């Protein structure tokens, strides 16, 4: 079988499964968030936590709950890491250092899962499931809750601007969606040989004749939510390149499907919730809105996948010519198709899991996965974050389109006034500011040069790739992705602190702006579409929104990309 045919079959299979799951999964999630019925165990949980599930929150109440819950999560996870040495299942591991504990706590609570440590030798078999795996569930549920709150802003007409109850949305997202789906995925992964054990490890003899200690852990259960919740942090240092996490081509496809399932299906959830089920025309219109967003995601995802496949299938250099492709840093069991498909999916979402060494990608392939993040991770984006990210860009596209043709800027019957556009613009500007400022300061500081695996005189190949590594790190942290170019050493206090702050601001500033936007929209009355209303469903708006996404990224990041991946590719 040729590589091109293998790539085509894998992509076709992934798209076919997602197409089959799109309607039932999307509609199920809409029912979960729209249901007025609380399950018995949910009611018990609300009573224990003294939560009134029938209370609606304004945007600032909702945002306060998000920030309060996330702050408590950071403190708990930080404390758990610091004292893990005196807790059960720690083996001979001691407590985690303050800088690493801070960075890791922030990383997992923000759904980034950036890992500046070796999991096997740092985190115990208690810290992994009780601390990190729990955050894999709830951090994903937070993103989904914010997306649903924004959808309610378009749907509701409320004088007070109520957008739901965060605690109810968090509970339902965790227990009704993420937990059962993860259970099924974990069973499938177990059938493929993914390990599940609390044993500390076993010794074996390596190929060089020396004794090697092989770490064991409850991998399958954490691997499932790692991918489904677009978290990405591996329980083993090699992440999904490790045979204990991702042993077969089948498990590789399962993990890719888990990464894409919820972000893709949330566009159906959006379409279902904004349509009126009692009005056939409104229901169809809502679904067309969702399909339009999905089309934009698909165009961007497919384009970058094609670029990555072409770049990695090339034969640049002696080694690539001998191997038949750019196989450095890749697993033979996945090949170029499985590697490229995984890389584009993990950077197009906020997952950040890897089944190859991204630092070993070709300049064009590495640039493609970097661009995937710099687009704002909306192709198709993380669980929740991708949907509210592309909706914010849709508002900007409507505003720009209205200015171009003199039409009224409206979206789903809600007027886009100065307040709405300001909030949308602020949300979009957070990530570029963090990436460019963080990268600029880092490359200027002389103290950080020694941490770059690639360096040299200005303009040399080493310095160009070293710049790409720094740019990738801050793009990953600010977008809550978590993947990295491994040539950059990020264990210093500067990187631990700077990247930790980028993760915090990159996660919660957009959330605050999006929730404020939801509250502002919810307080408006709906207006009927007229002759001057720009259509927001169909091919024309798909092109406008795609162009807006690309234009925003190009204007913002082209100079930085020209200094890094583009310059490297032209050498």
From Swiss-Prot:
Role, per record: Part of the high-affinity ATP-driven potassium transport (or Kdp) system, which catalyzes the hydrolysis of ATP coupled with the electrogenic transport of potassium into the cytoplasm. This subunit binds the extracellular potassium ions and delivers the ions to the membrane domain of KdpB through an intramembrane tunnel.
Subcellular location: Cell membrane
GO MF annotations, alphabetized: P-type potassium transmembrane transporter activity; potassium ion binding
UniProt-listed InterPro entries: KdpA
Protein name (Swiss-Prot/TrEMBL): Potassium-transporting ATPase potassium-binding subunit
Main location: membrane
Assembly and binders: The system is composed of three essential subunits: KdpA, KdpB and KdpC.
Leader sequence residues: none
């Amino acid at each position: 079988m040729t590589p091109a045919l293998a790539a085509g079959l894998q992509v076709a299979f992934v798209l076919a499964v997602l197409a089959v799951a799109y309607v039932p999964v999307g509609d199920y999630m809409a029912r979960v968030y729209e249901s007025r019925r609380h399950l018995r165990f949910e009611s018990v949980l609300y009573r224990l936590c003294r939560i009134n599930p029938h209370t609606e929150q304004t945007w600032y109440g909702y945002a306060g709950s998000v920030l309060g819950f996330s702050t408590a999560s950071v403190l708990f996870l930080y404390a758990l890491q610091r004292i893990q040495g005196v807790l059960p299942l720690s083996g001979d591991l001691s407590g985690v250092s303050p800088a690493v504990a801070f960075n890791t706590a922030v990383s997992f609570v923000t759904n980034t899962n950036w890992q500046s440590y070796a999991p096997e030798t740092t985190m115990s078999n208690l810290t992994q499931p009780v601390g990190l795996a729990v955050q894999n569930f709830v951090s994903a549920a937070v993103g989904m809750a914010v997306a649903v709150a924004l959808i309610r802003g378009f749907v509701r007409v409320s004088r007070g601007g109520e957008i739901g109850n965060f605690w109810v949305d968090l509970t339902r997202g965790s227990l009704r969606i993420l937990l059962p789906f993860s259970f099924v995925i974990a069973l499938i992964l177990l059938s493929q040989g993914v390990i599940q054990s609390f044993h500390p490890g076993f010794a074996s003899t390596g190929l060089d004749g020396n004794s090697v200690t092989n770490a064991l852990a409850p991998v399958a259960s954490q691997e499932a939510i790692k991918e489904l919740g677009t978290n990405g942090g591996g329980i083993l240092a090699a992440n999904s390149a490790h045979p204990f996490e991702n042993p077969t081509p089948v498990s590789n496809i399962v993990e890719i499907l888990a990464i894409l399932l919820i972000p893709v299906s949330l566009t159906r959830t959006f379409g279902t919730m904004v349509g009126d089920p009692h009005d056939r025309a409104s229901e169809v219109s809502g679904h067309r809105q969702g399909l339009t967003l999905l089309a934009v995601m698909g165009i961007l995802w497919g384009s970058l996948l094609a670029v990555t496949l072409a770049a990695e299938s090339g034969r640049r250099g002696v080694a690539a010519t001998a191997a038949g492709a750019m196989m450095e840093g890749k697993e033979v069991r996945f090949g170029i198709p499985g590697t490229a498909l995984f890389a584009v999916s993990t950077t197009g979402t906020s997952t950040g899991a890897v089944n190859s060494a991204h630092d070993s990608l070709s300049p064009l392939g590495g640039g493609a996965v970097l661009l995937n993040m710099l687009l704002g991770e909306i192709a198709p984006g993380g669980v929740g974050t991708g949907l509210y990210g592309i909706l914010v860009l849709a508002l900007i596209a409507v505003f720009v389109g209205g200015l171009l043709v003199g039409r009224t800027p409206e979206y789903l019957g809600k007027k886009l006034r100065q307040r709405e556009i300001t909030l949308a613009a602020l949300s979009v500007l957070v990530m570029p500011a963090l990436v460019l400022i963080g990268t600029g300061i880092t490359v200027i500081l002389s103290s950080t040069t020694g941490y770059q695996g690639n360096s040299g005189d200005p303009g040399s190949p080493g310095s160009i790739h070293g710049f790409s590594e720094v740019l990738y790190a801050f793009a990953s942290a600010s977008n809550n992705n978590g993947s990295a170019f491994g040539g950059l050493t990020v264990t210093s206090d500067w990187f631990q602190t700077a990247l930790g702050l980028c993760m915090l601001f990159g996660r919660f500033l957009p959330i605050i702006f999006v929730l404020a936007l939801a509250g502002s929209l919810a307080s408006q009355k709906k207006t009927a579409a007229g002759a001057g209303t720009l259509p927001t469903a169909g091919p024309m708006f798909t092109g406008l929104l795609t162009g807006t996404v690309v234009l925003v990224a190009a204007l913002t990041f082209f100079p930085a990309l020209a200094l890094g991946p583009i310059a490297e590719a032209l050498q």
